[in-house]
C-alpha cells in the first residue's frame, strides 16, 4: 500500500490492470517548489481530475458491488493540506457466486482508493496558486453588513484595471431603521406635598404635648398686709369717739359749813386764802356719746360728773385695750406656697396660692418671677425662656424654639421664614413643594435639577416622552435634524447619534448616487471619492458601464479608455 503517493508509472500499471490505456497526463517541465518535499513534479490539476473521473466511471461499470468509502489524506506536519474525499457508489448487483471473490475485490478497491487519494493530495500540492483564485469579481454577491455600520468590504472591479483608477464595488450598509426603540412613554409625576401653616392664639406659645391646649401666661397680683396709719385711726375711731367731760372735784368737807348735795357748780366768793372747789376739764375716750339732759329745758348738754371710782375703772379699761392692740400686731395673709411659712407684708398670689415675692421663682432656672408673666406646665411656674427651651417645638432648620407661627412639613416643624426652597431659597409660605432626599424644592427648581432633559431642546421633560437613541425626547422635538419633520410610523435613521429621515440620512452619510442623486442602498461603486449605483457608473461620453473594468478620470468624470484616448489624447 502506497503511503507517499503514486507516480505516473504506478498509475499506468494500475490502469493496465483495469484494462484501460495508459494515462495521457503530461508532466510539465517547470519544477515548482511545493510544500510536499517528496515530489518535485508539477501536474496539471484539470488533467488529473479528468483522469480520476474516467476511473470512477470505469469502476461504476464493473459488475461487482463497491461500497462507499471516504479516505482522508495523510497528515503532514510541515504544511497545511486540504482533505479531499470522494464517494463512489453503485446499484446493488445480483448475489455473487463466491464470497472470496467479493472479498478480494474489496481489498483491491481499498488499495486503489487509498492510492488515488494520496496521489490527488500530492498533485494538488504541486499545482501553484493562480492570481485568478483570489479575485473577487464585481458581480459577486456578498452578504450585507450589519445595521448601523458605516464600514463595508471593498471588492476590486476587475483584475485588469489599473491600480489608481479602479472603481471599487462595495456593499453599502443599510441604514439602521429604528422602529422598536422609539417608544412613547408617560413619565410619572413626582409627589406634590402641602405645607401646613399653623397659627396659635394668645401669645403663640407651643407645647411639646399636642394633646394639651397651649398655656397662656398669667399675671401676678401683689398685695401688702402691713396695717397703715389710716387703718389704726379707723380702729381707734370705732372704739372711742372723742367726748369732752367736765369733772368737778369737791373740796374737803368743813364741819362748820353746810354740805351741798346739789350736783352743780358752787361759786364761793371768799378770800383767796381760803380753800376753794377745783374744776378739772379732761378729754376722755369712753366709747359712747353724751345724751341730752331731759331735765334741762334749754336742751343743752350738761357735763357729766364722774366720781373717782368710775374714773379709775375707765382708765383701767383703756389701758387694757391699748395693751391688747400692741400685743396682737398685723394679721397673717396665709402660708407661702414655697417655704410653707406665714406671709406678712407683701404677698404674691398665683396659681391659687400665696407666695413670698422671693419664693415665687421659675421651676427650672430658679430666678424670681416677681410680677412678670409666667407659664404654667404641670402645675409648676416657668419663665418664658425656660418654657420655650423645654416645651416648645424647635425649628428643623435653626434648631431654635418656635414661639410664633410655624409650618409643619416633612414630619417636622419650621419657622415660616426658614421653610424655603433648597435651590432658590424662596419661602413657600404654606404652599406646594416637591421633596427629594428629605429636602423641599419649588416646582421650577425641582424639574430643572432632577428631571430628564430632552435630547432636542435640552429642557426638562414633565409629561410624555419618546425613548430613542439612548435618551428621551419631547414628542414634538423628535424630528429629523435636517428638515425638522416628524417621522412616519416612528421609522428613522441614525447618524452621529441624531435621527434623520431617509433622504437626509444618505446626504449626511455620503451614500447618495453621484449619477442619479438618489440614495444608494445595497451594492455601490466607490470611485472618484463618490458613490454610484453600479448601473450608473458609466463613461461620461459613450455611457457604457465602467463597474466591471478600468476607467480614466478627467475633470472629475470617468471615461473608458477608448473615449479618453479619442477626446484627450
UniProtKB/Swiss-Prot annotation:
Knockout-associated phenotype: Cells are less adhesive to the substrate and remain competent to aggregate, although multicellular development is severely impeded from the mound stage. They are defective in proper cell type proportioning, cell sorting, slug migration and form defective fruiting bodies.
Polar residues bias locations: 62-78, 162-188, 196-206
GO biological process: calcium-dependent cell-cell adhesion via plasma membrane cell adhesion molecules; cell migration; cell motility; cell-substrate adhesion; chemotaxis to cAMP; chemotaxis to folate; culmination involved in sorocarp development; endocytosis
Xref: CDD domains: LIM3_Paxillin_like, LIM4_PINCH
Name of the protein in its database record: Paxillin-B
InterPro entries: PDZ-LIM_domain, Znf_LIM
One Pfam family from the record: LIM
Main location (coarse class): cytoplasm
Species: Dictyostelium discoideum (Social amoeba)
Family membership noted in the UniProt record: Belongs to the paxillin family.
Entry keyword set: Cell adhesion, Cell junction, Cell projection, Cytoplasm, Cytoskeleton, LIM domain, Metal-binding, Repeat, Zinc
UniProt region (Disordered), positions on chain: 62-103, 129-311
Keyword Metal-binding among record annotations: yes
CC terms in the record's Gene Ontology section: cell cortex; filamentous actin; filopodium; filopodium tip; focal adhesion; protein-containing complex
Record localization: Cytoplasm, Cell cortex; Cell projection, Filopodium; Cell junction, Focal adhesion; Cytoplasm, Cytoskeleton
Presence of keyword Repeat: yes
Short sequence motif named LD motif 4, residue ranges: 311-318
Tissue expression per record: Expressed in the upper and lower cup of the fruiting body.
Molecular-function annotations in GO: metal ion binding
Basic residues: bias regions: 258-272
Function noted in UniProt: Required for cell-substrate adhesion, cell sorting, slug migration, and cell differentiation. May function upstream of limB.
Residue positions of motif LD motif 1: 10-18
Classification via SUPFAM superfamilies: Glucocorticoid receptor-like (DNA-binding domain)
Motif (LD motif 3): 232-239
Residue positions of motif LD motif 2: 106-112
Amino acid at each position: 500500500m502506497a503511503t507517499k503517493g503514486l507516480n505516473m508509472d504506478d498509475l499506468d500499471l494500475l490502469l493496465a490492470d483495469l484494462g484501460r490505456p495508459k494515462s495521457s497526463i503530461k508532466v510539465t517541465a517547470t519544477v515548482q517548489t511545493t510544500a510536499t518535499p517528496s515530489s518535485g513534479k508539477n501536474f496539471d490539476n484539470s488533467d488529473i481530475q479528468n483522469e480520476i473521473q474516467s476511473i470512477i466511471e470505469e469502476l461504476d461499470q464493473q459488475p461487482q458491488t463497491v461500497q462507499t468509502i471516504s479516505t482522508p489524506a495523510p497528515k503532514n506536519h510541515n504544511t497545511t493540506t486540504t482533505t479531499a474525499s470522494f464517494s463512489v457508489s453503485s446499484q446493488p448487483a445480483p448475489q455473487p457466486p463466491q464470497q472470496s471473490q467479493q472479498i478480494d475485490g474489496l481489498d483491491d478497491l481499498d488499495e486503489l482508493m487509498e492510492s488515488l487519494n494520496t496521489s490527488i493530495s500530492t498533485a494538488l500540492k504541486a499545482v501553484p496558486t493562480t492570481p485568478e483564485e483570489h479575485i473577487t469579481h464585481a458581480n459577486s454577491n456578498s452578504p450585507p453588513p450589519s445595521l448601523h455600520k458605516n464600514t463595508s468590504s471593498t471588492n476590486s472591479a476587475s483584475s485588469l484595471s489599473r491600480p489608481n483608477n479602479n472603481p471599487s464595488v462595495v456593499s453599502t450598509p443599510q441604514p439602521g431603521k429604528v422602529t422598536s426603540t422609539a417608544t412613547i412613554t408617560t413619565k410619572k409625576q413626582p409627589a406634590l406635598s402641602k405645607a401646613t401653616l399653623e397659627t396659635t392664639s394668645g401669645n403663640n406659645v407651643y407645647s411639646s404635648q399636642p394633646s394639651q391646649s397651649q398655656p397662656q401666661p398669667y399675671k401676678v397680683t401683689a398685695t401688702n398686709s402691713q396695717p397703715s396709719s389710716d387703718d389704726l385711726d379707723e380702729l381707734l375711731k370705732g372704739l372711742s369717739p372723742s367726748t369732752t367731760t367736765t369733772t368737778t372735784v369737791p373740796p374737803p368737807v368743813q364741819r362748820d359749813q353746810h354740805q351741798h348735795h346739789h350736783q352743780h357748780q358752787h361759786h364761793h366768793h371768799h378770800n383767796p386764802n381760803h380753800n376753794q372747789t377745783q374744776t378739772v376739764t379732761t378729754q376722755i375716750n369712753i366709747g359712747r356719746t353724751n345724751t341730752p339732759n331731759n331735765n334741762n329745758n334749754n336742751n343743752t348738754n350738761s357735763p357729766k360728773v364722774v366720781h373717782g371710782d368710775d374714773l379709775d375703772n375707765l382708765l383701767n379699761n383703756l389701758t387694757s385695750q391699748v395693751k391688747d392692740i400692741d400685743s396682737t400686731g398685723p394679721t397673717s395673709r396665709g402660708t407661702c406656697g414655697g417655704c410653707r411659712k406665714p406671709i406678712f407684708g407683701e404677698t404674691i398670689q398665683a396659681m391659687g396660692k400665696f407666695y413670698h415675692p422671693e419664693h415665687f421663682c421659675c421651676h427650672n432656672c430658679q430666678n424670681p418671677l416677681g410680677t412678670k408673666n409666667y407659664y404654667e406646665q404641670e402645675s409648676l411656674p416657668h419663665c418664658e425662656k425656660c418654657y420655650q427651651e423645654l416645651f416648645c417645638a424647635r425649628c428643623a432648620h435653626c434648631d431654635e424654639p418656635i414661639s410664633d407661627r410655624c409650618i409643619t412639613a416633612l414630619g417636622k416643624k419650621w419657622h415660616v421664614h426658614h421653610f424655603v426652597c433648597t435651590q432658590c431659597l424662596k419661602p413657600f409660605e404654606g404652599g406646594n413643594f416637591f421633596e427629594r432626599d428629605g429636602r423641599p424644592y419649588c416646582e421650577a427648581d425641582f424639574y430643572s435639577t432632577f428631571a430628564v432633559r430632552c435630547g432636542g431642546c435640552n429642557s426638562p421633560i414633565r409629561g410624555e416622552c419618546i425613548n430613542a437613541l439612548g435618551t428621551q425626547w419631547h414628542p414634538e422635538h423628535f424630528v429629523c435634524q435636517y428638515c425638522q419633520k416628524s417621522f412616519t410610523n416612528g421609522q428613522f435613521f441614525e447618524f452621529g447619534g441624531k435621527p434623520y429621515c431617509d433622504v437626509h440620512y444618505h446626504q449626511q452619510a455620503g451614500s447618495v448616487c453621484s449619477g442619479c442623486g438618489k440614495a444608494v442602498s445595497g451594492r455601490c461603486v466607490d470611485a472618484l471619492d463618490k458613490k454610484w449605483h453600479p448601473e450608473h457608473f458609466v463613461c461620461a461620453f459613450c455611457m457604457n458601464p465602467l463597474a466591471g473594468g478600468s476607467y480614466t478620470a478627467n475633470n472629475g468624470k470617468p471615461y473608458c479608455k477608448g473615449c479618453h484616448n479619442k477626446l484627450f489624447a
